[in-house]
């Protein structure tokens, strides 16, 4: 994947309120989002490019979420091993709007190491920014509520697959106890 053009970077820095596109503001952005000091060097490379794409997409395609809510929680990677894709962000925003209650993201972006640690499949959509696991109070508390939510979600444009502990979007029983009361949804 090629880095964003310098013209696009300048435009997106302005759109995101990050100031002029320069080394000082690149470093400021890195310090805001990258947890490890080793990733905070003021250099615009692949990691920073993925972060900028993620920041842009989160602002452009959602109104209810902050960029950090999607970060990989492993503490070893930058937190942004890829970026959330526009289709998935639009998808979860529609779900959030439909139910009208806050959505807690329980898992979104994952680096390969964290994905393996939590038992994710090798080709998990979390690795490419096309999946989110979430919990919504009063919407996903019981199996019946989660089934109802999945049946709504599967009718949305670009839906690929959803599941929870006890059910999936094909109407089959699923054993996924690690999911708790969360629902997984992914787009294609």
Which positions does each model-derived feature cover?
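Short acidic, glycine/serine/threonine-rich helix-capping segments at coil-helix boundaries
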Residues: 2-53
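Second-shell loop/turn segments in exported
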Residues: 12-18, 37-40, 74-85, 136-140, ...
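Structured segments of extracytoplasmic/periplasmic soluble domains
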Residues: 15, 28-36, 54-58, 94-98, ...
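Surface-exposed patches in mature extracellular/periplasmic domains of secreted proteins
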Residues: 39-41, 101-109, 161-170
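Active-site acidic/histidine clusters and adjacent loop/turn architecture
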Residues: 51-100
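Catalytic cores and adjacent binding grooves of peptidoglycan-active enzymes
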Residues: 121-188
């Amino acid at each position: 994947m090629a880095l964003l053009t310098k013209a696009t970077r300048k435009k997106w820095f302005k759109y995101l309120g990050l100031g002029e596109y320069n080394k000082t503001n690149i470093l400021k952005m890195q310090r805001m989002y990258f947890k490890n000091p080793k990733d905070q060097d003021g250099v615009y490379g692949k990691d920073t490019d993925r972060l900028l794409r993620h920041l842009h997409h989160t602002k452009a395609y959602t109104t209810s979420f902050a960029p950090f809510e999607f970060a990989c929680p492993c503490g070893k990677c930058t937190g942004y091993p890829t970026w959330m894709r526009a289709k998935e962000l639009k998808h979860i925003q529609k779900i959030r709007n439909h139910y009208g209650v806050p959505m807690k993201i329980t898992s979104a972006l994952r680096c390969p190491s964290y994905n393996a640690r939590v038992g994710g499949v090798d080709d998990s959509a979390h690795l490419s920014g096309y999946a989110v696991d979430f919990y919504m109070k009063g919407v996903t508390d019981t199996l019946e509520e989660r089934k109802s939510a999945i049946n709504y979600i599967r009718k949305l444009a670009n839906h690929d697959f959803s599941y929870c502990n006890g059910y999936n979007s094909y109407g089959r029983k699923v054993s996924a106890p690690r999911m708790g009361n969360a629902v997984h949804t992914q787009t294609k």
